[in-house]
Structure formats: structure tokens, C-alpha cells
Design a protein with these regions (language model features):
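Nucleic-acid substrate recognition interfaces
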Residues: 1-174
Length: 174
């Protein structure tokens, strides 16, 4: 059984800057990926798979600035959006493909294996390139309402909503 718990994060100013930066990078990667998919769609009438896109994007600066699984999740999200568009298009031929995200939008970032929860802190890994550019090893962010014995943390999604940061953590409960 799985359970999702939402934590309100309390990042320090520097940590908030890094979170903002990483979420902005995810938005830029989403838009780059979307641009390439649309280009292929216009040329061939087909959308490339997530794995084809990964090969095309592996040298992209935005792809390298995110942890690998986080960057892949951005592509999977876009793929799900395109799959939804294809289903809708069968019913309504005027349906539009997924839109580009606005520059100022902060995309959610998802971590699977690159995070740890210790007491009332979430430790998030960053990519090698981000470490080199920003000089940090990881982000350790405090949060409210720590409850122990929830099970094994499997996934963490960081979301910015109405001026506040939240972590949605999915636990596997035995």
C-alpha cells in the first residue's frame, strides 16, 4: 500500500534560490523537449518516444543540470501530455498539442532515488554539472510535521504553489 504525505518546506534563502533555479531548469528542459517533439511531429507526423528523446537531449545543457531521473521524469510528463492529446485528438480533431510552459513557471521536480529523509529534513541530490557550477553537494531542507514510522520513502516531488514550497512524499507501507 502507498501513502502520500505533503510537507511544507522551510528553505533558507540560499536553498530557496537553488530550488527556484532547479525548477526553472526543469521548465526549460520541458520546453526544449516539447519544441523537438513538435518539430518531429510537423516533419513526420509521429512523436518520438521518451527513449529517443533522451538520446537527443543527453547533451543538452538543461538535461545535464538536473539529476538524471529527474530529467527523465520531465520527458515522461511531456510524453503523458502527448498521449492525452492523441486520445483527445481522436474525438476532436481541433485539439492542440501540449503548450509550452511560461518562462516564469516553476515546474515540479521529482526525485526517486536521489533523496533521503532524515528526521525533519529532506536531502536532495543535485547533478554533477550543477555541483560544479553552483559549488554545492546537495540540498538539505527542513520541513514541518515530521512523523516517524511511515514506511519506506519511494518518491519525492517538490512543488512551488502560491509562494510556498511543498514536498509530496510517497511512502510504501508494509
Amino acid at each position: 500500500m502507498k501513502q502520500t504525505i505533503k510537507y511544507k518546506l522551510n528553505p533558507k534563502r540560499e536553498q530557496e534560490g537553488h530550488l527556484h533555479n532547479i525548477c526553472s531548469i526543469a521548465t526549460k528542459l520541458y520546453n526544449t523537449d516539447n519544441y523537438q517533439r513538435r518539430k518531429v511531429w510537423e516533419e513526420t507526423g509521429k512523436i518520438p518516444s521518451v527513449y529517443t528523446q533522451k538520446k537527443l537531449l543527453k547533451d543538452n545543457v538543461w538535461f545535464k543540470l538536473l539529476p538524471s531521473q529527474t530529467a527523465q521524469e520531465v520527458s515522461f510528463t511531456l510524453q503523458r501530455n502527448y498521449n492525452s492529446w492523441f486520445k483527445l485528438r481522436k474525438k476532436d480533431n481541433t485539439a492542440n498539442p501540449p503548450m509550452f510552459r511560461k518562462k516564469e513557471m516553476l515546474s515540479p521536480i521529482t526525485f526517486y532515488q536521489q533523496f533521503k529523509i532524515i528526521n525533519n529534513q529532506i536531502k536532495l541530490s543535485v547533478s554533477r554539472k550543477y555541483k560544479e557550477e553552483k559549488g554545492i553537494k546537495s540540498l538539505e531542507i527542513g520541513f514541518d510535521l515530521w512523523r516517524e514510522d511511515k514506511g519506506i520513502a519511494k518518491m519525492c516531488q517538490i512543488i512551488f504553489n502560491k509562494g510556498e514550497w511543498f514536498a509530496h512524499v510517497v511512502y510504501e507501507i508494509a
